[in-house]
Amino acid sequence: MTTSIKTNIRFQLGIIFSCAAFFLIASDSRAADSSAQPVDLTGKYPVPISVLTNGNWLALKTMPVGHQIFHHVPLEIGGEIHLWGEGKGTNHYSSYPEKVSDIAVNRKFEALYVYHGSYYKSPDGTPVFKVVLRYEDGSSATNTLSFGADILDWMVSPNEAPLRTPYATNSEIAWVGGQFSDTQKNRLRFCLTALNNPHPDRTVSTIDLISCKTRTIPFVLAMTTGPAGLLNDNAAKH
């Protein structure tokens, strides 16, 4: 068997295994909750969906985009919102900001579901970024997502067995699959975190995303508001 044929077979097997991994994760999710509503991030994505789907980087071409449902939560994945981290300050599209402000919401909800990934590892428990809910009455509430508890590196290490999952009870693996590049066969991993709104009776006007300026670079792909407890039916934590 020639080298080129062997290479082609290995590539096809890699795609098959990636698709299988995607199916296993996605099959855990039942129908989306009808009261959950994706947040429109269209004007906030510095990396738009066209880059994710039409670029040359295999990782971006093999990750899920558009309408997706993970763990009962409907998501609209239209790009990536990166925040600054010490691992790398810029990419080849734009600078990573320390803060992304005034994401319009204008509704009441019990929980905010954040679909995210990250580059560069930090020690477990390291704060990575904050999600600030700004209410119509001028008050605010802040949640902090930390490495290990909520956030994991988006590249799955080749020797990572079993698959590492977030250890916080309000965070889950949402999707695993794809492939980092033609030469690096690492699968990709994204997490989903449920942030309970301490004041569900108040209208949330906007949301801010703020970097904690540690080594890890977080990125948010989608957010959805809805009832609390959508992740509660999933498998127990390891």
Regions found by a protein language model. Give the residues of each.
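N-terminal secretory signal peptides that target proteins for export/translocation
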Residues: 1-11
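Serine residues within intrinsically disordered or low-complexity segments
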Residues: 4, 18, 27-29
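Bacterial N-terminal signal peptides
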Residues: 12-25
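N-terminal/edge-of-domain interface segments
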Residues: 30-238
